[in-house]
A protein has these predicted regions:
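Juxtamembrane intracellular "pre-TM" segments in multi-pass secondary transporters
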Residues: 2-8, 192-223
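Extracytoplasmic gate region of multi-pass secondary transporters
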Residues: 33-34, 217-273, 332, 336
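Helix-breaking motifs and short loop linkers at transmembrane-helix boundaries and internal kinks
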Residues: 45, 77, 98-104, 115, ...
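Conserved MFS/SLC helix-loop-helix module at the cytosolic interface between two early adjacent transmembrane helices
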Residues: 64-103
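Paired small-residue
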Residues: 88, 92-95, 103-111, 316-323
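Cytoplasmic helix-loop-helix junction between adjacent transmembrane helices
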Residues: 108-149
């Protein structure tokens, strides 16, 4: 069924499809180092800690890059900002295939992170303006499915190609292929993003300042929730190939379809979750109830399955990994939609820049912590249990701290005290 047939026509089916494909490319290009990890580590003589640093280093530039990316998304045409970022990250991916040592790989991972940092602030700005609340679940479900299919295809196709051609050739091919996305995107008619002059004419020049955004408890609770949830994503994204090969004895060719299946299940769940949430809203359910149900249920499923990964045999671990995929698929579209709902069209770029900046510190922490745990204990169990504990904290953040998930009245917020008390839950 096409996007237009599913009711995304008002958002612009082509825009949503291209954003989803950009998210797909984004995650293929950031995740291919994890797929290449077993080969690259042996060829270059890297330790698990060094490999963890390479996997983490992407976020050293990606995470702080969210802040200027959010600012640019609201000051310039977000479509052009996204195109420039993709050009940078596609080039960095291709050049990685030519790297000969740890230092060069580290520099290219930093460049990749800087280019990819524009993806979500620009996408959220576009969707916050273009999508109504009743369309937001499906639009974000497709965006999340692109994000989650990226590792699926990257792990499956990339893993098989690396086993055949070697990791260097695959990086070059993927980088060049990524750049081809620019042609249809730049040829797409501009989305209905209001210009700065339009906002001024509409009397919205006093729409929220960055200081006003930073005063909201909802923002800080959302940042905590994102950190706790994305820790699991980045543990799996970074270490799944090594975990399957070293712990359970799978070959590179066997690992690829297993890893891809986890991500594909997650992507399918995200599309179904987005569709179901919109149907629930149209049936009369409140936004707060719909979003919180998906956020908390997703993290609850992930928690149970992470504990199972730490405790079970190979067969049980595969089932638990599949369950983690379902949990991530439940959680991710609601994460995206919640930020867009709370921030509204005039603050979505900066809000998501801040939230993604702080939330994605998990991408820095998870690969390194897991690598250290594996080096010291010889097993992944401790890494999975840390992720499970954080997922529980994320449930508390969404259930008790974030408050009601509904559009913030920024005009009223201008006169509010710092981090005001939130209304009762409902």
């Amino acid at each position: 069924m096409s996007l237009a047939q599913q009711g995304i026509r008002g958002v612009g089916a082509r825009v949503v499809a291209l954003l989803a494909f950009a998210a797909f490319i984004n995650y293929v290009d950031r995740g291919n180092l994890a797929t290449a990890g077993p080969l690259l580590r042996d060829q270059l003589g890297l330790s698990n800690t060094q490999l963890g640093l390479l996997l983490s280093s992407f976020f050293w530039s990606y995470t702080p890059g969210q802040l200027p990316a959010g600012w640019l998304a609201e000051r310039l045409d977000p479509r052009r900002v996204l195109a420039a970022g993709l050009a940078v990250w596609g080039t960095a991916t291709a050049l990685t295939g030519l790297a000969r040592g740890f230092v060069v790989l580290l520099a290219l991972r930093l460049l990749l992170g800087l280019g990819e940092s524009v993806m979500y602030p620009t996408s959220f700005k576009i969707l916050a303006v273009e999508a109504s609340e009743g369309q937001r679940g499906r639009a974000n479900g497709f965006l999340a499915s692109g994000q989650l299919l990226g590792p699926a295809v990257g792990t499956l196709v990339g893993g098989l190609l690396m086993a055949w051609l070697g990791w260097r050739v695959v990086f070059i091919l993927l980088g060049v292929a990524s750049l081809l996305w620019l042609w249809p995107w730049l040829a797409t008619p501009s989305a209905r993003i209001p210009e700065r002059s339009t906002l001024l004419a509409a009397g919205l020049a006093d729409a929220p300042s960055t200081t006003m955004i930073l005063r909201r408890r909802e923002l800080w609770a959302s940042c905590l929730g994102q950190f706790c949830g994305t820790y699991t994503i980045y543990l799996v994204l970074s270490w799944l190939p090594v975990y399957l090969i070293n712990t359970h004895g799978f070959s590179m060719a066997q690992m690829a379809p297993i890893g891809a299946g986890v991500y594909a299940l997650s992507a399918g769940t995200s599309v179904v979750t987005g569709w179901a949430s919109d149907r629930w809203l149209l049936a009369g359910a409140g936004t707060n109830r719909v979003r919180k149900s998906a956020l908390i249920a997703g993290l609850a499923v992930a928690t149970a399955c992470l504990i199972a990964c730490a405790r079970t045999s190979s067969v049980g671990a595969l089932l638990a990994l599949a369950g983690c995929g379902v949990g991530i698929g439940l959680w991710t579209p609601a994460l995206f939609a919640t930020a867009q709902t709370l921030a509204g069209p005039h603050a979505a770029g900066r809000w998501m820049g801040i939230q993604n900046c702080l939330g994605n510190f998990a991408g820095i922490v998870a690969p390194v912590v897991t690598g250290i745990v594996v080096d010291r204990t010889g097993a992944f169990s401790g890494g999975f249990l840390i992720a499970a504990a954080l997922a529980l904290i994320g449930m508390v953040a969404y259930g008790l701290i974030v408050g009601r998930i509904e559009p913030i009245d920024w005009r009223a917020s201008a006169a509010s005290p710092l981090l005001p008390a939130l209304p009762p839950q409902g």
